[in-house]
């Protein structure tokens, strides 16, 4: 299908988003064209503002507009427990269940040799620095229950074994191959309750 160049550019831009193929991108592009100009400008401004004004917490790696993030800055949280997750969206999913009151560490990915991603390519070195603090008693590995998530959890657990820090893995009330962000609060809560030592 041949579209005018501005529509083609818009479709190509939408296709850069995960899970958006050519048909969905075209549908979104035509939806945007039907929007009021003020709404389109607000949408574009929201995209630019998010990109410019958000960064990663220097402590945990969670996405934030303040450094440290609101979780790391909260003095009422249990600083003896760190929950290790893959992405910021996993922190948001965990926070929805309101059962976990410790801190987080965001890896920004998983070990994936097939994709050329090793331990040094994700946020593991910063985790090791954080664990030099004598107040850390437990690390909960809450990576996704897929091949890469399991490999990353196993790597971290082996790395931490000599430290004497208790290392646990969330239970698999989550489907194998699933993502934390799609789990409901009850399932996540049960997975945290049923975590096991690794």
From Swiss-Prot:
Presence of keyword Zinc: yes
Gene name linked to the record: recR
Species name: Listeria monocytogenes serovar 1/2a (strain ATCC BAA-679 / EGD-e)
Source superkingdom: Bacteria
Record-given protein name: Recombination protein RecR
Keyword RNA-binding: no
UniProt xrefs under SUPFAM superfamilies: Recombination protein RecR
Family membership noted in the UniProt record: Belongs to the RecR family.
GO BP annotation list: double-strand break repair; recombinational repair
Domain Toprim: 80-175
Known function: May play a role in DNA repair. It seems to be involved in an RecBC-independent recombinational process of DNA repair. It may act with RecF and RecO.
């Amino acid at each position: 299908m041949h579209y005018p160049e501005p529509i083609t550019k818009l479709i190509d831009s939408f296709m850069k988003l995960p899970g958006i193929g050519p048909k969905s991108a075209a549908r979104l592009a035509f939806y945007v064209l039907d929007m009021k100009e003020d709404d389109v400008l607000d949408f574009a401004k929201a995209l630019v503002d998010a990109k410019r004004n958000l960064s990663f917490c220097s402590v945990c790696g969670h996405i934030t507009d303040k450094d440290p993030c609101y979780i790391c800055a909260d003095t009422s949280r249990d600083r003896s427990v760190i929950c290790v997750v893959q992405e910021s969206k996993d922190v948001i999913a965990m926070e929805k269940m309101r059962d976990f009151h410790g801190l987080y560490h965001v890896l920004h990915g998983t070990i994936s040799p097939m994709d050329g991603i090793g331990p040094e390519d994700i946020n593991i070195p910063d985790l090791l620095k954080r664990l030099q603090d004598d107040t850390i008693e437990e690390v909960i590995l809450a990576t996704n229950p897929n091949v890469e998530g399991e490999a990353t959890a196993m790597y971290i657990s082996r790395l931490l074994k000599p430290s004497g820090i208790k290392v646990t893995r969330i239970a698999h009330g989550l489907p194998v191959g699933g993502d934390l962000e799609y789990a409901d609060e009850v399932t996540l809560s049960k997975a945290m309750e049923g975590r096991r030592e690794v």
